[in-house]
């Protein structure tokens, strides 16, 4: 199937599955093309590409897999290509006269990543119009509602007004993204709270209300995919909602490094310093990547001191505690701990279920409790994987015209993940992981010692073996030094009770589940 045959059909599918406003605003105007054999969806700018990839790529790919499975995945990049009209009915492929735009010379395909920044240029000064300025300017020029009946027009005046307001809001949103690099999707309203992030969320909201005061810097650490980026960007979006004139910037540490090296190379160091010092809130993701770069660390040390002395807010994320960042300047390690340092924990079962329910609500899909529980038990490691699993199930729900996600649909959509989770886990793997986690010997786990520091990890390992393998109780007993099945049963029951009563053991158990499954 050619792109000219596929895209009109894809438009028809997307039109049928998306709300009318979303389709008209984001999908209908798209142009597409082919570069080096790769199908490309063009957005008018970086903001549009990021929005398309985060919100609609899954749906587009689901259609491609159904109708053109032999083709590689689409890439998303800024530019202009050919616009096709939507197929009138399924199978009717009537592309409109191609609208070839200037600059048809083939460009190398560059895939747009979700966390990619708009450009590698130094951070732009905030002297340009703010999002609020643009919105106010556009709204001021809108036509007023007529007091009397106007002459017949091709569209009602109210529709013109509504479209103009929508365009103004979208332009203002794009302007905000260009200035701040904040995603409009990452807000406190869209954040699901649970035990793993509740304290961090409360601190983040306090910072948004009074930046630069008590919690400065705010250092957030944890494994990949736990929601650090969502939480820190929510601070920026909330601050701008309360103070539209605030100067905010979110960036990845790689982009800070690139902009600094470019300033050194171009002898624009003074401009670089002023660009960063202007912000009221600076958010840097994955700060650990500046380690080992002496000049960059030295410059960031001075920038840090400026923010602290001027009571401007600095928010940093990392994968480990500040003290554990090997190769980081000791002065920076010390300063990273001056404010508030918090860890994001993997989401517990209740939080994972709540995330799935919120995703379903946002997508206009109903999910049965049994299906949500199944998916939440299958994906334990992080929020990103959980959302990815839901997107797959949601796509299956739409294409199969099943408005309710039940457990059978979830199993069918995620069957490859189910197979992957269970195909390599053995009792030996679990015993080894538990021994390393509790820093005891494997021989102790299998032996006869009954001291608490040995017996409890042994019971945890038995319980994990029961949950993650298909072994019977007698077989589990054999794997643990030839123990009787009643001993295994007693250990499993003891761990189940302790998980309800002892938060520390419950947390250890969840961490081991994630460690073993990944």
Swiss-Prot record:
- Subunit architecture: Oligomerizes as a right-handed, spiral filament on DNA at oriC.
Q: Where do the segments described as Domain II lie? A: 72-180
Give a GO cellular-component term: cytoplasm
Which residues does the record give as ATP binding sites?
Answer: 225, 227-229
Describe the task this protein carries out: Plays an essential role in the initiation and regulation of chromosomal replication. ATP-DnaA binds to the origin of replication (oriC) to initiate formation of the DNA replication initiation complex once per cell cycle. Binds the DnaA box (a 9 base pair repeat at the origin) and separates the double-stranded (ds)DNA. Forms a right-handed helical filament on oriC DNA; dsDNA binds to the exterior of the filament while single-stranded (ss)DNA is stabiized in the filament's interior.
State where the protein is found.
Answer: Cytoplasm
Per the record, the similarity remark reads: Belongs to the DnaA family.
Record GO biological process? DNA replication initiation; regulation of DNA replication
Q: Using the UniProt annotation, give all residue ranges assigned to the region (Domain III, AAA+ region).
A: 181-397
What is a single molecular function from GO for this protein? lipid binding
Gene3D superfamilies in the record:
1.10.1750.10, 1.10.8.60, 3.30.300.180, P-loop containing nucleotide triphosphate hydrolases
What the entry lists under CDD domains is as follows: AAA, Bac_DnaA_C
> Which residue ranges are recorded for the region named Domain IV, binds dsDNA?
398-518
Keywords, comma-separated and alphabetical = ATP-binding, Cytoplasm, DNA replication, DNA-binding, Lipid-binding, Nucleotide-binding
**What organism does the record attribute this protein to?**
Neisseria meningitidis serogroup C / serotype 2a (strain ATCC 700532 / DSM 15464 / FAM18)
Q: Where is this region: Domain I, interacts with DnaA modulators?
A: 1-72
Query: Which Pfam family is an annotated match for this chain, by its short name?
Result: Bac_DnaA
Q: What is this protein called?
A: Chromosomal replication initiator protein DnaA
In the UniProt entry, what is the domain comment? Domain I is involved in oligomerization and binding regulators, domain II is flexibile and of varying length in different bacteria, domain III forms the AAA+ region, while domain IV binds dsDNA.
């Amino acid at each position: 199937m050619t792109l000219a045959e596929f895209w009109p059909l894809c438009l028809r599918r997307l039109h049928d599955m998306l709300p009318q406003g979303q389709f008209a605003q984001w999908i209908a105007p798209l142009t597409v093309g082919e570069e080096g054999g790769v199908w490309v969806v063009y957005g008018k700018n970086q903001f549009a590409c990021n929005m398309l990839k985060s919100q609609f790529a899954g749906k587009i790919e689901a259609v491609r897999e159904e109708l053109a499975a032999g083709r590689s995945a689409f890439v998303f990049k800024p530019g202009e290509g050919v616009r096709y009209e939507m197929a009138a009915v399924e199978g009717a492929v009537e592309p409109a006269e191609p609208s070839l735009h200037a600059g048809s010379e083939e460009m190398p395909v560059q895939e747009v990543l979700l966390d990619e920044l708009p450009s590698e240029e130094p951070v732009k000064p905030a002297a340009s119009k703010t999002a609020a300025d643009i919105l106010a300017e556009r709204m001021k020029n809108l036509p007023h509602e007529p007091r009397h009946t106007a002459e017949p027009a091709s569209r009602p005046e109210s529709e013109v007004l509504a479209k103009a307001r929508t365009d103004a809001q979208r332009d203002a949103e794009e302007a905000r993204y260009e200035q701040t690099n904040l995603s409009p999707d990452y807000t406190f309203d869209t954040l699901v709270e649970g035990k793993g992030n509740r304290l961090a969320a409360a601190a983040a909201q306090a910072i948004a209300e009074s930046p630069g005061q008590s919690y400065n810097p705010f250092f957030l650490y944890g494994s990949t995919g736990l929601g650090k980026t969502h939480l820190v960007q929510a601070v920026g979006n909330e601050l701008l909602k309360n103070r539209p004139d605030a100067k905010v910037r979110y960036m990845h540490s790689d982009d800070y490094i690139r902009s600094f090296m470019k300033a050194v190379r171009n002898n624009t160091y003074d401009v670089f310093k002023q660009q960063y010092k202007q912000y009221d809130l600076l958010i840097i993701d994955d700060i650990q990547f500046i380690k080992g770069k002496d000049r960059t660390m030295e410059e960031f040390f001075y920038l840090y001191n400026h923010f602290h002395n001027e009571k401007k807010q600095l928010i940093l994320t990392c994968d480990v505690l500040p003290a554990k960042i090997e190769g980081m300047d000791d002065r920076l390690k010390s300063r990273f701990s001056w404010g508030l340092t918090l860890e994001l924990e993997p989401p517990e079962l209740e939080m994972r279920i709540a995330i799935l329910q919120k995703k379903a609500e946002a997508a206009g899909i109903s999910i049965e409790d049994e299906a949500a529980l199944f998916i939440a038990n299958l994906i334990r490691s992080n929020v990103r994987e959980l959302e990815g699993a839901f997107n797959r199930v949601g796509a299956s729900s739409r294409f199969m015209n099943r408005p309710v996600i039940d457990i059978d649909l979830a199993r069918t959509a995620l069957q490859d993940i189910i197979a992957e989770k269970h195909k390599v886990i053995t009792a030996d793997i679990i015993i080894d992981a538990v021994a390393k986690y509790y820093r005891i010997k494997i021989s102790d786990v299998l032996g006869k010692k009954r001291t608490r520091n040995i017996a409890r990890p042994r019971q945890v390992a038995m319980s994990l073996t029961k949950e993650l393998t298909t072994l019977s109780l007698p077989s589990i007993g054999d794997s643990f030094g030839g123990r009787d099945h009643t001993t295994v049963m007693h250990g499993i029951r003891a761990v189940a009770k302790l998980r309800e009563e002892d938060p520390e053991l419950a947390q250890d158990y969840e961490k081991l589940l994630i460690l073993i499954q990944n």
